[in-house]
């Protein structure tokens, strides 16, 4: 089946609005990640359903029509709380989620402008440009609230590590690498055996699994290297084949690549057991980058290490000074990372990973 047929099967409303399916096909053909396409398709289909209910033609919808969609998002029951009273009330869909839902709507209208089917974009922030998510200077419909990433305090981190110390070695090395190399969830779970260079203690993060589609190479510390060596020995008892680094040890999926969702469940279980409910798969990344900023790393060095395309994203982790990445790791990162991962590396492997 062609991807356009799959889109229509998954989101029938796109098939009722041909330009919508065509727009999503463009982004798919441009090589956007499957999860990005899924988010775009879901977000635009929600908007189109609201248009149909309100009797509005999406090709001629105006700012007021998009505002109706925003209102519905703000009134939608949140799975973890009550209905929202206002965009910044703290209940209902978060400001970030609403912004995400508006991205495909804005891009779709930008596409219609480029196609000559309308003159302006009611969502604002510029026109459809392949490879870019935004442009222009017009203010968006919904104010964007920028919050600093949450990171655990030292006691919370110790509580997490105390629980993690009793985890199987696979889970401990994943936590250690997630912190040590500031890896995103998808980057961590997608690591392959040939992405690891134990001799140089370096990881290759392949372009196809990164958020900005740019490959990078990042170092990891000696304590994590010791833990990784132990895991590789464990992995060899499951499979000697090259391929995905982290494998399932459950009866149902024994030897299969570990999924993003399984890793999320592992981290969630650890967080709840430690009494640190806000701890997530992305927390280790935030903590690592914050530590680098505290140690005086220069802005562009952190951006390179993190795989940030825009240094504006990196600014939240503070201002820095210049030096070579690997050299900085040896001189500065080790003494902070070593104690952070000591509890992970100090316990013998126990139990079976799921």
Predicted regions and their residues:
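Short, basic (Lys/Arg/His-rich) helix/loop patches that form interaction surfaces
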Residues: 264-304, 308
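Conserved tyrosine-mediated DNA breakage-rejoining catalytic core shared by Y-recombinases
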Residues: 131, 185-186, 190-230
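N-terminal core-binding DNA-recognition domain of tyrosine recombinases/integrases
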Residues: 21-35, 45-138
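C-terminal secondary-structure termini that scaffold catalytic or DNA-interacting sites
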Residues: 3-5, 331-354
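Basic, Lys/Arg- and aromatic-enriched nucleic-acid-binding interface segment
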Residues: 152-185
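Active-site/catalytic core of tyrosine-dependent DNA strand-transfer enzymes
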Residues: 221-276
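Catalytic-site neighborhood detector that most strongly recognizes the C-terminal catalytic loop/helix
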Residues: 209, 306-331
């Amino acid at each position: 089946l062609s991807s356009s047929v799959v889109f229509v099967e998954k989101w029938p409303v796109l098939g009722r609005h041909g330009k919508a399916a065509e727009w999503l096909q463009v982004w798919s053909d441009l090589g956007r990640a499957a999860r990005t396409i899924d988010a775009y398709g879901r977000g635009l289909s929600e908007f189109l359903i609201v248009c149909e209910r309100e009797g509005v033609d999406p090709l001629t919808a105006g700012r007021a029509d998009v505002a109706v969609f925003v209102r519905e998002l703000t009134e939608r029951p949140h799975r973890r709380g009550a209905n929202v009273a206002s965009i910044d009330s703290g209940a209902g869909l978060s400001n970030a989620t609403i912004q995400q839902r508006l991205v495909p709507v804005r891009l779709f209208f930008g596409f219609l402008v480029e196609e000559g089917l309308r003159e302006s974009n009611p969502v604002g922030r510029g026109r459809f440009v392949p490879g870019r998510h935004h442009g222009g200077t017009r203010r968006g419909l919904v104010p964007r609230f920028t919050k600093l990433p949450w990171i655990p305090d030292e006691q919370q981190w110790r509580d997490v590590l105390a629980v993690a110390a009793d985890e199987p070695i696979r889970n401990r090395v994943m936590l250690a690498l997630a912190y040590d190399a500031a890896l995103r969830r998808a980057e961590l779970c997608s690591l392959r055996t040939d992405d690891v260079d134990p001799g140089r203690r370096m990881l290759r993060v392949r372009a196809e699994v990164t958020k900005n589609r740019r490959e990078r190479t990042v170092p990891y510390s000696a304590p994590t290297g010791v833990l990784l060596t132990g895991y590789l020995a464990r992995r060899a008892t499951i499979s000697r084949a090259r391929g995905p680094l982290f494998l399932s040890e459950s009866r149902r999926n024994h030897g299969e690549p570990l999924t993003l969702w399984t890793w999320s469940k592992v981290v969630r279980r650890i967080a709840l057991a430690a009494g640190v409910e806000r701890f997530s798969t992305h927390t280790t990344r935030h903590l690592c980058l914050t530590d680098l900023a505290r140690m005086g790393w220069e802005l562009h060095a952190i951006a390179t290490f993190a795989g940030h395309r825009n240094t504006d994203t990196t600014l939240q982790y503070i201002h820095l000074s210049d030096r070579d990445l690997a050299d900085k790791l040896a001189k500065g990162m080790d003494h902070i990372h070593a104690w952070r991962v000591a509890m992970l590396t100090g316990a013998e492997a126990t139990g079976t990973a799921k």
